[in-house]
Amino acid sequence: ILGPDGARMSKSRGNVISPDPYVEKYGSDVLRLYLLFGFSYREGGPWDDNGIKAITKFYDRVERLSQKVISLHANKNDKIDAAEKDLLYTRNYTVRCMTRDIEDFSFNTATARLMEYLNALNKYDTADGEKNIKLFKECFSDFILLLAPFAPHFSEEIWEQLGNKKSVFLSSYPE
């Protein structure tokens, strides 16, 4: 990671960024997500405070959706129509691509896929018509399982709020 000026971080240049104030202000999970999303594992890049603010917005969107999902109660609607098929397609595509991205150390791409999956979950949530709540909760749970390696504390907290008894890290990776 380069300094904000684009030069290699160095005490002598005075462009070293300490993570401590960022952890204090945003939390370790937001900082971790920023580092994974903002920089290619192989290439790096310059530090940018706007990037961490963007990750904070993503984090907030996950939090808002999690509160909605937690408050939902199962319904008898178990239909799989076009909206459900779209959501399942996005879920399966995300799992497949993220698995490959993680194996290739393309963490920035894997994180971008999480953002796309969150967009699909929000789209399903705000669409007109009756929802398949069971499917929606399952897809959101899979999202949390995928998020867990990138934001472990946040994911564990949501996982427990979803009513799961064992740790998110003792749960099976989505297939």
Question: Where do the PLM segments sit?
Answer:
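Primarily short, surface-exposed interaction patches in extracytoplasmic proteins
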Residues: 2-3
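C-terminal, charged and often intrinsically disordered regions of DNA end-processing helicases
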Residues: 12-20
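Helix-rich, typically C-terminal accessory recognition domains appended to large enzymatic cores
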Residues: 21-175
